[in-house]
């Protein structure tokens, strides 16, 4: 079975849309998680808050589309059906990767660290709170399940 990259990208985009919605829902309930904001402040001056959020949200959704394509390409190459059970495993691996990268990328981020407006997250966001590693993993598992469920549904009807 050949991967359909357009459907994979759309599925990843929708998965990232759901992930972003859940991030801001958690933020509304007092959790200090705002991954799109971290992405935005990497490229836009922190004083331009509306521009930060606009660019960050768009970039986060495009990154999600890229991850959707990567999921489908790798699963198809492994001759595994891209469906929701595979989404659980790939989402977990994705969450581990993102959690590790947050700590590494923070070292070069212009607004993260001591004497900067954003506190350093540490590996898996541990420095942002006790629940943060669980949120990062859980949200990316949800992303994987949503992305691959949409892809599988779209192809099989």
Residue ranges and their predicted role:
Residues 1-157:
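Juxtamembrane/disordered regions of integral membrane proteins
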């Amino acid at each position: 079975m050949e991967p359909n990259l357009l459907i994979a990208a759309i599925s990843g985009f929708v998965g990232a849309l759901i992930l972003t919605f859940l991030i801001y829902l958690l933020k509304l309930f007092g959790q200090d998680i705002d991954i799109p904001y971290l992405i935005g402040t990497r490229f836009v001056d922190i004083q331009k808050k509306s521009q930060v959020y606009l660019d960050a949200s768009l970039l986060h959704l495009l990154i999600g589309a890229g991850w959707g394509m990567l999921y489908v390409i790798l699963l198809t190459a492994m001759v595994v059906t891209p469906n929701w059970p595979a989404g659980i495993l790939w989402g977990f691996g994705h969450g581990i990767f993102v959690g590790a990268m947050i700590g590494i990328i923070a070292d070069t981020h212009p607004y993260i660290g001591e004497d900067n407006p954003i506190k350093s997250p540490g590996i898996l966001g541990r420095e942002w709170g006790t629940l943060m590693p669980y949120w990062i993993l859980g949200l990316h598992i949800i992303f994987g399940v949503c992305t691959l469920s949409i892809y599988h549904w779209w192809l099989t009807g």
